[in-house]
Amino acid sequence: MPLFDLKSPYSLAGDQPQAIDTLTKSLKNKNHYQTLVGVTGSGKTYTMANIIAQTNKPTLIMSHNKTLCAQLYSEFKAFFPHNRVEYFISHFDYYQPESYIPRRDLFIEKDSSINDDLERLRLSATTSLLGYDDVIVIASVSANYGLGNPEEYLKVMEKIKVGEKRAYKSFLLKLVEMGYSRNEVVFDRGSFRAMGECVDIFPAYNDAEFIRIEFFGDEIERIAVFDALERNEIKRLDSVMLYAASQFAVGSERLNLAIKSIEDELALRLKFFKEQDKILEYNRLKQRTEHDLEMISATGVCKGIENYARHFTGKAPNETPFCLFDYLGIFEREFLVIVDESHVSLPQFGGMYAGDMSRKSVLVEYGFRLPSALDNRPLKFDEFIHKNCQFLFVSATPNKLELELSKKNVAEQIIRPTGLLDPKFEVRDSDKQVQDLFDEIKLVVARDERVLITTLTKKMAEELCKYYAEWGLKVRYMHSEIDAIERNHIIRSLRLKEFDVLIGINLLREGLDLPEVSLVAIMDADKEGFLRSETSLIQTMGRAARNANGKVLLYAKKITQSMQKAFETTTYRRAKQEEFNKLHNITPKTVTRALEEELKLRDDETKIAKALKKDKIPKSEREKIIKELDKKMRECAKNLDFEEAMHLRDEIAKLRTL
């Protein structure tokens, strides 16, 4: 029986059928690695969705940045509305890890800010994986970081049935063991409240509903689900499965074992420092660890508890830590890992371990942490790539690693469903590049189309932006310090024609879906390096591939080896695309992508502004507006539009003060 129910208005076209067939056969033949080489705009995401539906396995889709993760999450939610599509990225809005700089004798405390919505989504992902098979998780590099033992997590979860005998007080203690906190005043995620013989539990992985358990003596009489906002009963249940409020929650037996294990390690390390006559390190470690042990004994947690993860999970020193992969593979279940934009993602994954180890080794050496803190780490690249699962690498420009691992299990997806060709390209002398490009931009703007320009340095980007603005062009500059929300706003403004030209350095490559862009200009294309490598050039040139008038200008004094290889790849693909179009009588059409959904949120904003301008709003009307806005705020948070959710939250606060 199929696990996944794929819904889409699209039909397969171009190279999609053969790519899906090739890769699905490879996966069903139990091959460990396979690669999809798909050009920009060829519908790789839809191909991935079809492969998931046909292979019928829980799937982890990994990407190298949060922006692309959010985009993939939105697309897969639409493709699989009846399945569990989850989102797993870092839950920190801000994170400064603890560190020590010996030459300055400077210890920097850990400082972080946890995003409540992202934490909920992470918990939702792990609970779905433990309870269901029809799960697709969209994840960032966070999937490689340590989590609690999934088997311990299963032990802590609790199935509650109507009619079963349970001591009321022991049930409350069980909730505390599961990581829930009792709070009679502020009832929100991860908390519970007890009123008479009723216990309300707000699951940590759900912000829309809470569960009410009604007792009659020591017997559970009724279980009901309530709407968290309206506080009205939605449905009654015969039983309910309640999961822990934390991915690090453990039972009392495991907790006691962990405390004993930490004490034993502390004794050994203190003995080492004493023998080395390192009194400062001895006292520092003793004081810090004993304080943490007191907190763990009293509350089950402490600040920086992740540094003791090995003791809670039962892992041996240097053993591979538990991570999201272990939740996918629970019960020896087969699963698929899709690495999107693998040419960037895999190198990023490879560099994580070394940086983490360098910082923590200093903390251990100087007595700030026990040696077991080194085992709270991301996966080493070898551990990641040799996980007991199947991998599908997806990229327009895969590296040698992906192709060597995949051997013959490689599928090309060069033909676009729209018939669009890889863009024409032209090399021009860089001596007069600013004036020459200005003339080209005017022609593009006259056609109501947009331009992307990539430079090598921040200074050149700023100066170019200044020059073109003075010459009358509507131009913006996007630099590396701009966060994801502002970046999305700039891209949206470009699509809405609030300006015509966007200049950047390394922000114009992967994942930018801009059908309005018909001209991409690459300044100083002959300066060999990361930003002008074969892969970077092909990715950048691909930004013009969603428009029928797509064209790339490369300004250079010579043609480098990277340029030559990029030209050969583009020429090969374009020839194959032209041949397919001619054979099937296809006329290339510019991709169209609606902005209606993005604009809808702005309509809500306008309504709020009008409401706030009123000097007097009747109390009944004000409560109605607040309730409506609160509902929209929750919807925005669910859809990962946190900017809009925060805006709505602030406006609700203003209304409550009227």
UniProtKB/Swiss-Prot annotation:
Gene3D superfamilies: P-loop containing nucleotide triphosphate hydrolases (3.40.50.300), UVR domain (4.10.860.10)
Keyword check for Metal-binding: no
Keywords noted in UniProt: ATP-binding, Cytoplasm, DNA damage, DNA excision, DNA repair, Excision nuclease, Helicase, Hydrolase, Nucleotide-binding, SOS response
Motif Beta-hairpin mapped to chain: 91-114
Helicase C-terminal domain: residues covered: 433-607
Domain UVR: 623-658
Superkingdom per UniProt: Bacteria
Keyword DNA damage found: yes
Residues holding ATP: 38-45
General function of this protein: The UvrABC repair system catalyzes the recognition and processing of DNA lesions. A damage recognition complex composed of 2 UvrA and 2 UvrB subunits scans DNA for abnormalities. Upon binding of the UvrA(2)B(2) complex to a putative damaged site, the DNA wraps around one UvrB monomer. DNA wrap is dependent on ATP binding by UvrB and probably causes local melting of the DNA helix, facilitating insertion of UvrB beta-hairpin between the DNA strands. Then UvrB probes one DNA strand for the presence of a lesion.
HAMAP family given in the database record: UvrB
Domain notes: The beta-hairpin motif is involved in DNA binding.
Protein name: UvrABC system protein B
Species for this entry: Helicobacter acinonychis (strain Sheeba)
Encoding gene, per UniProt annotation: uvrB
